[in-house]
Structure formats: structure tokens, C-alpha cells
Curated annotation (Swiss-Prot):
Superkingdom to which the source organism belongs: Bacteria
Underlying gene: hrdA
Official protein name in the record: RNA polymerase principal sigma factor HrdA
Region (Disordered): 1-96
Subunit structure: Interacts transiently with the RNA polymerase catalytic core. Interacts with RNA polymerase-binding protein RbpA.
DNA-binding feature ranges: 357-376
Protein's UniProt keywords contain Amino-acid biosynthesis: no
Pfam families cross-referenced by the UniProt entry: Sigma70_r1_2, Sigma70_r2, Sigma70_r3, Sigma70_r4
Length: 396
């Protein structure tokens, strides 16, 4: 009998138990990638992660809310979105390049968003900003309404962070176009992330545009402003940098069309500017060069060694000054100690700084009139000296 039951059990098809479907929830937070990218902003939100989780569980379920954020195991409808580029040559080598590669790996793990998910997140961001403004401007709200607004603020911040993280690789893609203009890749990405945050706050989902199309403008604007403010050794105002870019673009276009370099007058006529203004802009467009920059292949000659010093005396002037000094010393050696000292102080022959009669009088303890008499007597004696004719030759 037992053998028959065993045979019957072998012939019976196996049965499987179905797992119960998961309960509906309003928001599923993206899986934690790294502590740097996905840690909760407790300082800005004013709530701990456990408190935010309690807020999410307390919210009633809404139709279609479960699709706001993709489940870790669910397939993601990947829209057209740039992939994180490989590190550039400027970022190769050194600890900063290792950090940048780690950053690329981290943002590459974050799942992208579909168009519907972007709209849903943007709607929550807008509701959170509205609730935050309402709480700030209306302090006399009842407790229940204030609690509901707090929930909207928390949900808005979570949606804002999710929308930012999903578009971090867009910033890296845009930053590739600005490499080599004065800022490193890390600095460009940092400035572009600030523009991305601004784009999330200003995005209007009701217009029907993709978020990446709208955010690209803000990212480029942030990078361009950073290049204008930080890229140059000598800072130039932003409006002057924009004018420089206009002049350079016109120069390049005219060079391609004509095959020769346009003159400042031609560029000024094309831009409806004064030729003097164009010349000044072209002068400001020049980049400074270090005087210690090596010249040649040997690297033993610096650029500063080849630049003429306009203030330096010529060899002829140096030789004439040396002869004049020798003749003056020969003439002054014929005077007394007091007379020689007065002439040297009066005309600055010792240190190059002439003294007044009062200053010399205080040094010798006599009046300025007495110093004037000594000076007059000494000059009369020098005029009749044998070297007087030689000294007059230096006056020509």
C-alpha cells in the first residue's frame, strides 16, 4: 500500500507557492550606492533617516506612485543619456585622478530615469519647495497642516536628490567640452554640479521638455561663469570675457572666409565697435607668460634672460658715469673736510639724496645761512679748478 502511495506521489505534478505581492508604497528610495552620494542630508532636512522613513510609511498610497523610482531589480527604461566618459589625459596620475575615477564609478552605478519618472520627481520637488516656502512665510499654521507640509518638504528633498544623482554623468559629459581652458576636470565637474542643482530647482515639467535638455543650459552657464572668474591669472570682468569671446569668434570666422588675418578695423566694423575698443580687447585676450618659462630644448635659458631691460643703462652711459665719478672724486679731494662734506650732502653725491640747507645746518650745528656761505665759496673754488673744463664736458 505504501509503495502505491509513493508511486502516486511521484506521478503527481509539483505545486509552487506564489509569494504575496509587495504592499503599495508611495516612494521607493534608490538603493544606496556610496556614503558620499546617497547619505541623507540631515542638516538641510532637519530629520534623521529613521524619521524620514517614518514619514514615508505614514503617507497614504497613491495610484502610480510606486513607479516614481525604479526597484533595484526591475528593468529600467534607459532614455538617451550620455555615459560617463573615461578619465582625460589631464586627470591621469596622482591622487586626484584616482578620486575622479572613483567618482565616475560611483555615478555610473546610479540608474537613469525615464521621462515619466523625471516628471514625477519634478512634481515632488515643486511641491516640496512650495511647502517649504509656505512653512517659512506662515508661522501660525495648525499642527496637522504643518505636519503635512513637513512631509511634502521631506519628499521633495528626497526627489531632488534622486533627480540630481541620476544626472551627474550629464555634468561629466558637458565638462569634457571645457577641458583645457584654465580649469581642471574636477573643478569643472564641481561647478557643473552647482548648475545642475539650480536646474532641478528651476525645472518646469509642465512645458513638456526633457530635463536633460533644460539642465544642459544651466550646467554650461555655471562652467562658463567659473572659467570667466577663475581661469585667468589676472581676473577680467565677466562682461569683458564675453566681449573677448565675441571678438575672437569673429576673427576666426573672417580668417576662414578670407584666408588672411583681419585687421582690428575690420573686426570693429563687423561688431559695430570702435577700433580702439577692439584693440584693447585683443590686448586683454593675451595670456600672461612666466618669465621663468624655459626656452629651447636644453631648458637652461629662461624667457626672462632674453628680454631687454629698458631701464638699464647702456654700456656707453655706464662708462661715462664711471669717468664722471672719478673726476668728481679728484676735484673734491682738493677741498677741505668740511667743504667736501657740505657739497656731497647738498647735491646727493654720496647716497643720491640731496639735503636742504636746514638739514645740513642741523648736522653741523650751524645756521642755514652759514651753510649757504660755505656752499657758495666752495663752488667758486671749483669753477677755477683745473678739472672744471673736463666736468663741463659732461653737461653737453
Amino acid at each position: 500500500m505504501r509503495g502505491g502511495q509513493r508511486r502516486a506521489s511521484r506521478l503527481r505534478p509539483p505545486t509552487y507557492r506564489r509569494r504575496p505581492p509587495p504592499a503599495a508604497s508611495i516612494l521607493e528610495v534608490a538603493p544606496v550606492q556610496t556614503q558620499t552620494l546617497t547619505q541623507t542630508d540631515t542638516a538641510a532636512g532637519g530629520a534623521e533617516p529613521d524619521a524620514e522613513r517614518g514619514v514615508l510609511l505614514a503617507m497614504p498610497a497613491q495610484p502610480g506612485a510606486g513607479a516614481a523610482l525604479p526597484h533595484p531589480g526591475a528593468p529600467v527604461d534607459v532614455p538617451e543619456h550620455p555615459e560617463p566618459p573615461p578619465p582625460t589625459r589631464t586627470e591621469s596620475g596622482g591622487p586626484s585622478s584616482d578620486l575622479f575615477r572613483q567618482y565616475l564609478r560611483e555615478i555610473g552605478r546610479i540608474p537613469l530615469l525615464s521621462a515619466a519618472e523625471e516628471v514625477d520627481l519634478a512634481r515632488r520637488v515643486e511641491a516640496g519647495l512650495f511647502a517649504e516656502e509656505k512653512l517659512r512665510c506662515s508661522p501660525g499654521l495648525d499642527d496637522r497642516l504643518a505636519l503635512d507640509l513637513d512631509r511634502l518638504v521631506v519628499l521633495g528633498r528626497l526627489a531632488k536628490r534622486r533627480l540630481i544623482e541620476a544626472n551627474l554623468r550629464l555634468v561629466v559629459s558637458v565638462a569634457k567640452r571645457y577641458v583645457g581652458r584654465g580649469l581642471t576636470m574636477l573643478d569643472l565637474v564641481q561647478e557643473g554640479n552647482l548648475g545642475l542643482i539650480r536646474a532641478v530647482e528651476k525645472f518646469d515639467y509642465a512645458r513638456g521638455y526633457k530635463f536633460s535638455t533644460y539642465a544642459t543650459w544651466w550646467i554650461r552657464q555655471a562652467m562658463s561663469r567659473a572659467l570667466a572668474d577663475q581661469a585667468r591669472t589676472i581676473r577680467v570682468p565677466v562682461h569683458v570675457v564675453e566681449l573677448i569671446n565675441r571678438v575672437v569668434r569673429v576673427q576666426r570666422r573672417m580668417l576662414q572666409e578670407r584666408g588672411c588675418e583681419p585687421t582690428p578695423q575690420e573686426v570693429a566694423a563687423h561688431l559695430d565697435l570702435a577700433p580702439e575698443r577692439v584693440g584693447e580687447v585683443l590686448r586683454l585676450a593675451q595670456e600672461p607668460v612666466s618669465l621663468h618659462a624655459p626656452v629651447g630644448e636644453e631648458d637652461d635659458v629662461a624667457l626672462g634672460d632674453l628680454i631687454e631691460d629698458g631701464d638699464a643703462a647702456s654700456p656707453v652711459e655706464s662708462a661715462a658715469f664711471l669717468l664722471l665719478r672719478q673726476h668728481l672724486e679728484a676735484v673734491l679731494s682738493t677741498l677741505g673736510e668740511r667743504e667736501r662734506k657740505v657739497v656731497q650732502l647738498r647735491y646727493g653725491l654720496a647716497d643720491g639724496r640731496p639735503r636742504t640747507l636746514e638739514e645740513i645746518g642741523r648736522l653741523f650745528g650751524v645756521t642755514r645761512e652759514r651753510i649757504r656761505q660755505i656752499e657758495s665759496k666752495t663752488l667758486s673754488k671749483l669753477r677755477d679748478h683745473a678739472y672744471a673744463d673736463q666736468l663741463r664736458g659732461y653737461l653737453d
